[in-house]
Curated annotation (Swiss-Prot):
It catalyses: (S)-2,3,4,5-tetrahydrodipicolinate + succinyl-CoA + H2O = (S)-2-succinylamino-6-oxoheptanedioate + CoA. It comes from Escherichia coli O1:K1 / APEC. GO terms for molecular function: 2,3,4,5-tetrahydropyridine-2,6-dicarboxylate N-succinyltransferase activity; nucleotidyltransferase activity. It is found in: Cytoplasm. It holds the Pfam family THDPS_N_2. Belongs to the transferase hexapeptide repeat family. Its main location: cytoplasm. GO terms for cellular component: cytoplasm. This is 2,3,4,5-tetrahydropyridine-2,6-dicarboxylate N-succinyltransferase. Keywords: Acyltransferase, Amino-acid biosynthesis, Cytoplasm, Diaminopimelate biosynthesis, Lysine biosynthesis, Repeat, Transferase. Its EC number is 2.3.1.117. Homotrimer. GO terms for biological process: diaminopimelate biosynthetic process; lysine biosynthetic process via diaminopimelate. The keyword Acyltransferase applies.
Amino acid sequence: MQQLQNIIETAFERRAEITPANADTVTREAVNQVIALLDSGALRVAEKIDGQWVTHQWLKKAVLLSFRINDNQVIEGAESRYFDKVPMKFANYDEARFQKEGFRVVPPAAVRQGAFIARNTVLMPSYVNIGAYVDEGTMVDTWATVGSCAQIGKNVHLSGGVGIGGVLEPLQANPTIIEDNCFIGARSEVVEGVIVEEGSVISMGVYIGQSTRIYDRETGEIHYGRVPAGSVVVSGNLPSKDGKYSLYCAVIVKKVDAKTRGKVGINELLRTID
């Protein structure tokens, strides 16, 4: 694996010179191997190590290099034709392979090659970009988008129209992460490398980026870039220091543990927020 990483790192330093016409065999094979490993879930752009999320930047570099070495090509679809550098994940799947990998794909869901979809996942008409990782038992609902390199945990529900931000550039930026057992309400957006920690519930229409204030009404604490585990979050506003105006924020209205979530439905958690 170290040799593969070295090839990617070296090629990335001269990426501006690389084109589909002049890409050498070693670089091309290394990039294709990484994309295949991401596609199968053997590698992932970010993973939790000793309780902390670690981003493997060299894998993002490989994804970026794939755009340098590949030319646009016609992609056949059921309703249309497309023209892009990245093939679709399921282009060569037959029924046996779908059965073996154990997930459902409802037309016209689109998944790019290099994204991993785990068993027991359901993809409604949605979009999953290259480098993303979608773990077991997750529902990606209608018109939801999982951006490039985003990491989605086990038993997550991404409701209709949810946007999970992608990140390829700037290179140092971390991917957006939704940990296990989270619920993201319809039309909400989580972007810019924000981490929604395990067991959190995000209400409909909540927008969270790195600069969004995440206000815990119980403690008065303000978080940035991280929704603490077990939070129930709704959209709100906080007043300015001079009291002349208010600005948007996300509000943690309560905390719940796994036992409570198991006994109480998501809708009930969001209804009883006073």
